[in-house]
């Protein structure tokens, strides 16, 4: 497992320009993914990946669970995290790569973020109930044990229980931004998220910039501002 300094050296030497396949943005069932951390290792091996980063929302809890499996499979596991942040009222995601999953400050802050998510989830569920949908926090948590529940988990719950015809419909009709059951939540400032990732020894990367719906000028300003705050990279390929 490498640290941030090693990552920098490898980057300068063109280490990531070879033919090895990697994936630096992967979620597990510790947040809104569909595979457990251990299952992700198996999937990565089958896909022929040389390395992958486990970057669950607001948690590094899956990293220790995947480490032994990754070692046995001969795959490099990059410890990571994805933080939902606020940039002048716009939600922007920052991925941290090579973070220390045991860093005390990171653990403390992510616990705060998770509590905010829990409060928000309860309000979303209440709003969905007000629309006549059959969902409870108890049922949602029972189907998503020991993980950070996101809107994607809620959307999948609605779909799997026949409340909507697709996950997309759940977002489009109910819980997407500006929809009737959407509930905002506290988000750490983008600049503070970058500082937190650095404090945990990590590399801060702007995630999927194409998804923010910004024009060229606004996107350039976002990148310029975050670079001034210490941003290390930009996600160029996202799927």
Predicted feature locations:
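An N-terminally biased module of ancient metal coordination in phosphate/nucleic-acid-related enzymes
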Residues: 8-90, 174-177, 188-239
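Extended substrate/RNA-proximal surfaces in nucleic-acid metabolism proteins
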Residues: 71-220
């Amino acid at each position: 497992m490498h640290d941030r300094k090693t990552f920098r050296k490898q980057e300068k030497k063109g280490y990531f320009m070879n033919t090895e396949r990697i994936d630096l943005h992967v979620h597990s069932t510790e947040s809104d993914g569909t595979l457990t951390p251990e299952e992700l290792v198996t999937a990565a091996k089958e896909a022929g990946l040389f390395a992958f980063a486990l970057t669950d929302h607001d948690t590094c809890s899956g990293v220790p669970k995947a480490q032994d499996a990754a070692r046995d499979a001969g795959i490099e596991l990059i410890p990571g995290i994805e933080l939902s942040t606020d940039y002048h009222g716009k939600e922007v995601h920052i991925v941290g790569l090579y973070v220390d999953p045991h860093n005390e400050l990171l653990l403390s802050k992510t616990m705060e973020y998770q509590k905010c998510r829990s409060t928000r989830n309860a309000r979303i569920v209440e709003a969905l109930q007000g629309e006549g949908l059959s969902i409870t926090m108890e049922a949602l948590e029972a189907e998503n044990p020991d993980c950070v529940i996101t809107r994607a988990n809620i959307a999948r719950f609605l779909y799997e229980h026949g409340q909507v015809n697709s996950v997309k419909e759940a977002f489009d009709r109910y819980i997407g931004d500006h929809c009737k059951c959407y509930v905002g939540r506290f988000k750490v400032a983008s600049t503070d998220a970058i500082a937190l990732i650095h404090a945990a020894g990590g590399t801060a990367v702007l995630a999927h910039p194409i998804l923010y719906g910004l024009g060229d000028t606004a996107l350039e300003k976002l990148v310029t501002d975050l670079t001034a705050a210490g941003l290390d990279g930009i996600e160029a390929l996202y799927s």
